[in-house]
Amino acid sequence: MTEYFWAFTRAFIVTVIFMPAVIKFLKQSKEQAVIRKLGPDHQSKAGTPSMGGALFIAAASLSALIGSVAYSGKIGFVMVLIPILAVVAYAIIGGIDDALKMIHHADDGFRFIPKLLAQTLCAVVIMIIMWIMQIPLILNIPFIGVFNLGIFYFIFLWFWLVGWSNATNLTDGLDGLLTGTSLIVYLVYTWIALGVHNHIIVIFNASIIGALVGFLLFNKPKAKIFMGDTGSLALGAGLAIESIVLGIPFSLLWFGLIFVIETLSVVIQTIGYHFWKKRIFPMAPIHHSFEKFGWNEWQIDALFWIVTAIIGIIGILYMS
């Protein structure tokens, strides 16, 4: 229990201490200025620095590594390697994407195909490490059964990592929205990991949560800094990989329901406009529709956080 506390504290302190310096550095660099063109109120956010995810992901990863090694030595190092690799790899992809946006002063950084190839490469590396570590490549499908997919497990792993990293990326459209919702989902999986005595995942999650709590102090409305794709892609990849490690990947469809809804709203909006030239929602992702209805960011954040918390509690009670 002590190591859980220190994992949280280390990540929190590092994030809180160094974030002001990061914000100052990014503001002084004209290349780092970000102008969001999405959302009804995007103009008021012009000039807010991005890539805050780089610091809190680094803080969380370092804290998780220290905590895991302190808890169980080499075994802890090996066990925490996969979740750390997942968040760091996708943070790097997001970081390149953010950097390209800033350099070109555009909404799009990585083009679709190169970005997908980079995400696929990361999934391949993670899959190889899982195979080397002899992690069972089985898929537990609720109400159906357990299947040993063998090499075909890669297809599922690829889909899960790419899908969830992009789902959280779509959710990161308002100050504090993704920070708060993902924090709650990580809390839920921390509770589950405690129940199955997976102490390394608990340490990893405690580190992520500590970093997110620290980041939220700067990311709450009105945000002083955004996490950027650096943070949003990494958070989704982290949730995807730990749901797999815990052996309950499909639970994320419930606990991460907000991310699913955000993604579906974009898909539905795109299909509706493509086939019928009509917008199904006032704006997508769906959190922007609430802005169109006159809600402020705090109200939308509160709604999404509360819904995520209720979903988490219901899920935990059901699994108990």
From Swiss-Prot:
Keyword Nucleus appears in the UniProt entry: no
GO biological process: cell division; cell wall organization; peptidoglycan biosynthetic process; regulation of cell shape
CDD domains per the UniProt record, alphabetical: GT_MraY
Cofactors: Mg(2+)
Recorded metabolic or biological pathway in which this protein acts: Cell wall biogenesis; peptidoglycan biosynthesis
Principal cellular location given in the protein's record: membrane
Function: Catalyzes the initial step of the lipid cycle reactions in the biosynthesis of the cell wall peptidoglycan: transfers peptidoglycan precursor phospho-MurNAc-pentapeptide from UDP-MurNAc-pentapeptide onto the lipid carrier undecaprenyl phosphate, yielding undecaprenyl-pyrophosphoryl-MurNAc-pentapeptide, known as lipid I.
Protein name per UniProt: Phospho-N-acetylmuramoyl-pentapeptide-transferase
